[in-house]
Amino acid sequence: MARYTGPKCKLARREGTDLFLKSARRSIDSKCKLDSRPGQHGAKQPRLSDYGIHLREKQKIRRIYGVLERQFRKYFAEAERRKGSTGENLLQILESRLDNVVYRMGYGSTRAESRQLVSHKAIVVNGEVVNIPSYQVKAGDVVSVREKSKKQVRIAESLALAEQIGFPGWVSVDPKKMEGTFKNAPERSELSSDINEQLVVEFYSK
């Protein structure tokens, strides 16, 4: 399955919520009518069946993190194997992806841009260049911008904005050095309450 490269607003309208695909730090443009379906006439969202509700939540989470279906299923299987809550485990696996950590540290303004930085070898983990967006970052890992990439204006601008707003508690970042530490995978209480991971667990359990 190919990665979606079309209008980001269309995805947000399909899910009926801001997926933060266009900007990392602010809500989506008001022109994007989230209560209307995508399309020329933008009909109102229909009432969903129980299956539809579960499917939409799964799709929403998958699109927020920019993960394809096959990989998302693998993450769910891994989450089931781990001790504890399967739903929380799933979110921690997604949050530990290198592209997501780069986003959380403010190097990229969106997860898509952060994924591009990783793929273009602009990111270093513990002193080694890593160009795999799905790489699982571990507690204590140091994630920084590669020396030759520190002059990129987009990285500096994104970091400046992230510093103003504040970094999440599970990472520590030195904006001047463009270096950060992944302290630990976030607890469920630290993540968005707009996500209902239990619906994903129920979806795959049916």
UniProtKB/Swiss-Prot annotation:
Keyword tags: Ribonucleoprotein, Ribosomal protein, RNA-binding, rRNA-binding
An annotated Gene Ontology molecular function: structural constituent of ribosome
CDD domains tied to this protein: S4
InterPro entries: Ribosomal_uS4, Ribosomal_uS4_bac-type, Ribosomal_uS4_CS, Ribosomal_uS4_N, S4_RNA-bd, S4_RNA-bd_sf
Keyword Ribosomal protein among UniProt keywords: yes
Signal peptide coordinates: none
PANTHER family from the UniProt entry: 30S 40S RIBOSOMAL PROTEIN, SMALL RIBOSOMAL SUBUNIT PROTEIN US4M
Protein name stated in the entry: Small ribosomal subunit protein uS4
Organism: Laribacter hongkongensis (strain HLHK9)
Lineage: Bacteria, Pseudomonadati, Pseudomonadota, Betaproteobacteria, Neisseriales
Gene: rpsD
